[in-house]
Each structure stands twice: as C-alpha cells, then as structure tokens.
C-alpha cells in the first residue's frame, strides 16, 4: 500500500473532502491524525476506523492548536503528509460591502491557517528527510465571480503560497502542491448560510443542478474525487511534482460555464434565500 508506515495529518477531517481524504489515506495504509473543530463528528470518524484514524479537536485559526496537532503527529513518528484542508464559505460580501472583522476571520481560516500549518510542519518533515504537503485551494482562485470576494482572494493566496513554499522547501525534500475543487457535494455551501433540514435538501438540489449545468462532466464532484487527487500528490507516484496544482472541477475551468444573470442572485445569495427568516 502506498502509505504504509506513513503518518498523515488531515485538517477539516470531520466531513466532506477532509473526511474522504482521511479515509483514503487510512485505506492505503497510513496512520491518520484527523483534526477538526467539530469534536463529535471527528471522534465518530476515528471510532469507526479500526484504529487507523486518531482524532484531535483543533481550531486552525489558533496557532498554538496547530502546533499541538503537529506535536502529536511528531509523537506518532510523523508527520510525513500534511493536508491543509480546513475551511468554510467565509464572508459572503462583495468588495464594496466587506467589513474588516469578517475579512480577517475568512483570511485566518482559509489562508493564515495554511501558512502556519506549513511553517510548523516543515521543520518536523525536514528532520525526517522530507514529506508532502497538499493544500486545498479552489477553482475560485482562478476566476472572478466563482465565489464570494474574500473566499476567492484567500484561495488565490493559498495557490500562490503553495508555489512559494514549494520553492523554499524543495531543499528539504518537501513537496508542496494544491488541489482546486470545483462544485463538490459537501456541506460548505449550505453551512455557510446556516441551512438545515428541508432547506438543506433544497440547497443540495440547487448545487447539484448548478454542477450539472456548469461543467462538461455533467455532475457535481464527490469528496472522493478530491481525495483521489490528494492521495496522488501525497504519494511517491508524484515524487517529481511540486509547486503546482490539480484542477478537480469536471472541466468547469475549460468548458462552457454556468453564469448567473446579473439581475439574479449568485449561488450564495440563492442559497441564503432558502434560509428561514430571522
């Protein structure tokens, strides 16, 4: 198995892409240290893994918790792999509507946490002779209008950070790459606007419809689609690949795009309209 004897750290592991990737690493032989702010879902993942996955509640916006997480990975004999994946929809405002606090929260979660994960994992990996880091960016890093402003800017930052870190860390035999998901069936959209129950089901149907219209491959992606790309980039099969990214978007970035009419809401606004009135 590709990851036998490896210690893989996965943030945002309690659901969606992170959960699928933690399971993929475990299935291929790794010992996985799963991190998430959701302690209930994270521990449930670990409890069902036959000991292959261990969970540590982690708020990646707090540097000391990132340090503690990687310290636990070191105690296990790692880290060999770091998947910086924790995230959420973030501030939904347009550029002329943003506020400083919301902007900072989005950057802390989506960009600063990735930088700090790399910063604190790199010395540990270097002492082991190398490692692999994969960061979750987004197709929104490449085009305006694909997602809210702050989210898109943060993900563009992750993409450039990936390149800079790859150049800096190659001397330590540490590879750094990114995955750029397109429309993936996770809770990130509905959670961003606080949807539950019937409204969440409606939101899932809306996202599925957008995915079918927006991409040459006429379906939204699955978390497992991203996990497969992450596993490849983290493996020795990608030993000569660093400083780049893989688009996992069903052709969204190259094919005919779904575009909202300027007089109708964007995706997040459409989802927000499903939420019950306060």
At which residue positions do the language-model features occur?
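C-terminal substrate-recognition "lid" of short-chain dehydrogenase/reductases
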Residues: 2, 118, 219-248, 253
């Amino acid at each position: 198995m590709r990851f036998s004897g490896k210690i893989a750290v996965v943030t945002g592991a309690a659901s969606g892409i992170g959960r699928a990737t933690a399971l993929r690493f475990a299935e291929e032989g790794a010992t996985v240290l799963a991190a998430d702010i959701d302690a209930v879902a994270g521990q449930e993942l670990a409890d069902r893994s036959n000991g292959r996955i261990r969970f540590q509640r982690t708020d990646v916006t707090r540097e000391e918790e990132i340090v503690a997480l990687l310290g636990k990975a070191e105690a296990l004999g790692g880290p060999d792999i770091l998947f910086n994946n924790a995230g959420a929809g973030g501030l939904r405002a347009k550029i002329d509507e943003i506020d400083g606090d919301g902007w900072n929260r989005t950057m802390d979660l989506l960009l600063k946490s990735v930088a700090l994960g790399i910063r604190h994992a790199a010395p540990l990996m270097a002492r082991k002779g190398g490692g692999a880091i994969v960061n979750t960016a987004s197709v929104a890093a490449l085009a305006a209008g694909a997602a809210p402003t702050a989210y898109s800017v943060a993900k563009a930052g992750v993409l450039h950070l990936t390149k800079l870190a790859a150049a800096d860390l190659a001397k330590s035999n540490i590879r750094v790459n990114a995955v750029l998901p397109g429309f993936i069936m996770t809770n990130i959209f509905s959670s961003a606007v606080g949807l539950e129950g019937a409204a969440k089901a409606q939101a899932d149907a809306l996202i599925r419809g957008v995915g079918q219209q927006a991409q040459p491959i006429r379906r939204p992606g699955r978390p497992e689609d991203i996990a497969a790309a992450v596993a490849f980039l983290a493996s020795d099969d990608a030993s000569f690949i660093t400083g780049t990214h893989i688009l996992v978007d069903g052709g969204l970035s190259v094919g005919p795009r779904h575009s909202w009419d300027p007089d109708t809401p964007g995706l997040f606004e459409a989802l927000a309209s499903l939420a019950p009135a306060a």
